[in-house]
């Protein structure tokens, strides 16, 4: 039986290959080009021995009649500890010029999600050291978190800070999948990890903006497969994806190239299924856990767009970054009224944490309602209680800002890691009026409440 086929049509990244009728490849089989490093992945069987494939690499120089060999297996990538500290592409090949990976085991990138009876739920909290996140939308170990934000509000910087904090404090293994992001960010990220001495605990998989859609669509699965392998060894792994929107976008490009009819806003008709297939694999089993943090670009700041809206349903916590808060110079620009977490429940985090978080939100919500009155009539028209509310809300707003370790180069102020206990103590004090006499500038860009008191002395 012949496993050789020949190219009959090339349209951009979509290549049609003809095989003898008894040797037709299965969907998702990997095909390799003779005398070239290019791999094709079968997407459809068109009939008469012809299969439609997506090129995982540049299709420049391909022409009809070229020979292709069916490997009779899916794309497999290296897994295990040899991948740590290395940068790989969608096929698991090294792109850091540091020689072969040398992995002993390989796994196919398409796998089924763990069965229902293998799953395990966890309510253990993962402390991030970022005040606003730990207070308002705490993360669960083995949970899924989305960082939602438009262009330029700080998704990648937040993600890098989370990786740095968790990698240093949590000291487990991490896998980072760069899906359709800027190559410069990938480079910065690599050096940031190197400087923080956590590179030997991170496996990096990149399919950046300049890559063909096939690479960007599959690179998330490559990273996920590596994370699953660590989980199946009984470890607790962190899996970072930047950016899940580009995964959807690559799916849209591939879908259009394959000739499928687009659905709402031009997205692929299989959007929910593609997203579900990826997200359902990111889960914790009885052997180990995957805690996933995903950056989600929000097109035109519209959270109802089909791509972010589909992602919402899969997450345990959502961190929403707001342009309005960023414009006030408050970073991280997390919107405390829009961000949510399933863990913010008195049975999970305790009464003290829950009540403090809710009171912070109520104070900020009251300030939001009063802002129109203040804009029209000024502060003098408010009742004494409302004036106090506004003053505390402005302090809370500023206290939610924090200097980041990864942003030291830009800000010049050293990063701060604030423990959850310290965070709750600080916000509780503001709400109870313990710091009513301290000017609001003292609360801006500091770590714990002790620093506020120190800073306030310099204003006197």
UniProtKB/Swiss-Prot annotation:
HAMAP family given in the database record: ATP_synth_beta_bact
Family to which the UniProt record says this protein belongs: Belongs to the ATPase alpha/beta chains family.
UniProt organism field: Nitrosomonas eutropha (strain DSM 101675 / C91 / Nm57)
Keywords assigned by UniProt, alphabetized: ATP synthesis, ATP-binding, Cell inner membrane, Cell membrane, CF(1), Hydrogen ion transport, Ion transport, Membrane, Nucleotide-binding, Translocase, Transport
Function noted in UniProt: Produces ATP from ADP in the presence of a proton gradient across the membrane. The catalytic sites are hosted primarily by the beta subunits.
Quaternary structure note: F-type ATPases have 2 components, CF(1) - the catalytic core - and CF(0) - the membrane proton channel. CF(1) has five subunits: alpha(3), beta(3), gamma(1), delta(1), epsilon(1). CF(0) has three main subunits: a(1), b(2) and c(9-12). The alpha and beta chains form an alternating ring which encloses part of the gamma chain. CF(1) is attached to CF(0) by a central stalk formed by the gamma and epsilon chains, while a peripheral stalk is formed by the delta and b chains.
Superkingdom of the organism of origin: Bacteria
UniProt-annotated location(s): Cell inner membrane
Enzyme class: translocase
Protein name: ATP synthase subunit beta 1
GO cellular component, one term: plasma membrane
